[in-house]
């Protein structure tokens, strides 16, 4: 097969590991900078062009769309879909997961556990919003934030009101979320492919920081997840419609809670922490799906 890897960063560990996984299974891997693609949208033969050349002959793509280019990245993925190319994560599912509010609403609809979350537009709703999520301390998140950036822990009601007022004054969209104190600055990252959790690790934030993102200095360790956590991670990925995803889970006194579903999860941290390859299962899943599409067989993931 000819597999395109949509990534702005060809030298990144994640990109290189995907290339290696494709090649090790006998496939041609082509790294494509998403932002260098341009499209011919017509009713006869839609096409994608890249640095002066039409991209043809692809069986599948693996989107690694950075959050900062979600709109354009989804347009490129959608164009590949229109050309009949299989996308490991389709454009609609990527867009769903990137919209934090929509993602939480989808999880809510499926009855999947998550921290109580509030969303408002007017400053005069702030006191009720704070009470709605259980009062301070609470977490305030920018909807557009990624990798722990734009996330604030407000220790008191006064601090929460000040931060929320400041964000709303800047016309920023924010979520107000209950603080799960018992998680103690840690979460569990599950790497899911299809209907399987391939690997999982516990991420612990640095001393004094409630955010556990490895990009912010957190550290990872191997963790054994429960059957409930495994089932919940897979259900969260299915709620988004994704195939490949990282699911972040908080352990709370009332059971596991989904914090986020990431459509382009980091590969380096979880592979180096667990010693488990997560890239080969991605390619194996693509092989199965492409073969099923060619023979029109029912797809059993």
UniProtKB/Swiss-Prot annotation:
EC number(s) from the headed UniProt entry: 6.3.2.-
Gene3D superfamilies linked to this entry: 3.40.50.20, ATP-grasp fold, A domain, ATP-grasp fold, B domain
Domain of life: Bacteria
Keyword DNA-binding: no
Name of the gene encoding the protein in the UniProt record: rimK1
Residues binding Mn(2+) 1: 248, 260
Residue positions binding Mg(2+) 1: 248, 260
Keyword flag Transferase: no
Cofactor note: Binds 2 magnesium or manganese ions per subunit.
Record: residues binding Mn(2+) 2: 260, 262
GO biological process: protein modification process; SOS response; translation
Limits of the ATP-grasp domain: 104-287
Binding, ATP: 141, 178-179, 187, 211-213
Organism: Shewanella baltica (strain OS155 / ATCC BAA-1091)
UniProt KW keywords: ATP-binding, Ligase, Magnesium, Manganese, Metal-binding, Nucleotide-binding, Protein biosynthesis
Cofactor(s) demanded: Mg(2+); Mn(2+)
GO MF annotations, alphabetized: ATP binding; metal ion binding; ribosomal S6-glutamic acid ligase activity
Pfam families assigned to the protein according to its UniProt record, in alphabetical order: RimK, Rimk_N
HAMAP family: RimK (MF_01552)
Residues reported in the UniProt entry to bind Mg(2+) 2: 260, 262
InterPro entries, sorted: ATP-grasp (IPR011761), ATP-grasp_RimK-type (IPR013651), ATP_grasp_subdomain_1 (IPR013815), RimK (IPR023533), Rimk_N (IPR041107), Rp_bS6_RimK/Lys_biosynth_LsyX (IPR004666)
A GO CC annotation given for this chain: cytoplasm
PROSITE patterns noted in UniProt: ATP_GRASP (PS50975)
UniProt name for this protein: Probable alpha-L-glutamate ligase 1
Entry's family note: Belongs to the RimK family.
